[in-house]
A protein has these predicted regions:
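Alpha-helical transmembrane segments in multi-pass membrane proteins
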Residues: 15, 35, 39, 93, ...
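Intrinsically disordered, low-complexity non-transmembrane regions of multi-pass membrane transporters
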Residues: 112-135, 169
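Juxtamembrane boundary at the C-terminal end of a transmembrane helix
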Residues: 255-263
Length: 263
């Protein structure tokens, strides 16, 4: 789809918005929509592809990565809300917070370059599009699956060796239940496992929504590794990407809190 005329049409339509908000081309809007539809790490992959094809600069790519590293509705509503917490309402609250958090987060990392690239159009490659797409998809699936398996194995070992005992002990002194602490720490490493553990703690709906929103927007180190395999192509330091994910997580959790208080 990245090679079709649909992308060029979307780019032209979204240029006024993305240029005004983030000082990047309209193609950033396409990356954003693909990311919120497909989830991690699609946004990172498309951003890296655009940079490698010289459609965006390194500075623009760094800005785009701040608001296009997102989860998708299938995971948020289907897996987390319905599958783990048995609550559709929770899913919609988290999804809205997650998307708004990403949009706001992008403003914090607005491109500061002089940019007149918002009218870029994507050029169709001369190679076989089907072959390239199939190859890229297979590599992406293997990459994602590999990091998930490795992260799950590392987390299982850490839990088995009780390596979270120290932070659990520290937070317990502030009245925080050990199961909640363990769930959050697990989610920071592998988000799906952490959220599943959180759903079994029996905490309130409001607290579940806020913590889940934070963890999903942060993504977990497993997702960080997946995304960074692509993002490093335009010299984005991991420390900068980590900062982007932390601010996204804080903003999303804050938006979740506001939504809960209002509605």
């Amino acid at each position: 789809m990245s090679y079709t005329a649909i992308v060029n049409s979307a780019t032209k339509f979204l240029s006024p918005f993305t240029h005004r908000l983030y000082n990047v081309g309209g193609v950033a809007g396409y990356v954003f929509f693909m990311s919120i539809i497909s989830g991690y790490p699609i946004g990172a992959k498309i951003t890296a592809d655009l940079y490698q094809n010289k459609q965006i600069t390194s500075g623009q790519a760094k800005t785009i990565s701040a608001f296009t590293s997102t989860s998708g509705p299938l995971f948020i509503i289907g897996t987390v809300a319905v599958g783990f917490f048995q609550s559709h309402r929770l899913g919609f609250i988290i999804l809205i917070s997650h998307i708004l958090g990403a949009i706001i987060n992008g403003l914090l990392y607005r491109n500061k370059e002089n940019s007149n690239t918002h009218n870029y159009t994507l050029q169709s490659p001369t190679q076989n599009i089907l072959n390239d797409s199939m190859y890229s998809s297979i590599i992406s699936i293997m990459l994602v699956g590999g990091f998930i398996a490795i992260s799950y194995m590392i987390l299982s070992i850490m839990l088995h060796l009780n390596l979270f005992s120290l932070p659990i002990s520290i937070f317990s002194k502030f009245g925080i239940d050990k199961n909640i602490t363990s769930s959050i720490l697990s989610g920071i490493i592998e988000v799906t496992t952490g959220l599943n553990m959180l759903s079994k703690t029996g905490i309130s709906f409001n607290l579940s929504a806020i913590i889940s929103s934070f963890l999903i927007s942060f993504g977990g180190l497993s997702i960080h590794a997946q995304a960074y395999c692509y993002l490093k192509s335009f010299n984005l330091k991991y420390s900068h990407f980590l900062k982007q994910k932390i601010t996204h997580a804080i903003i999303s959790a804050s938006v979740t809190f506001i939504i809960i208080m209002i509605f």
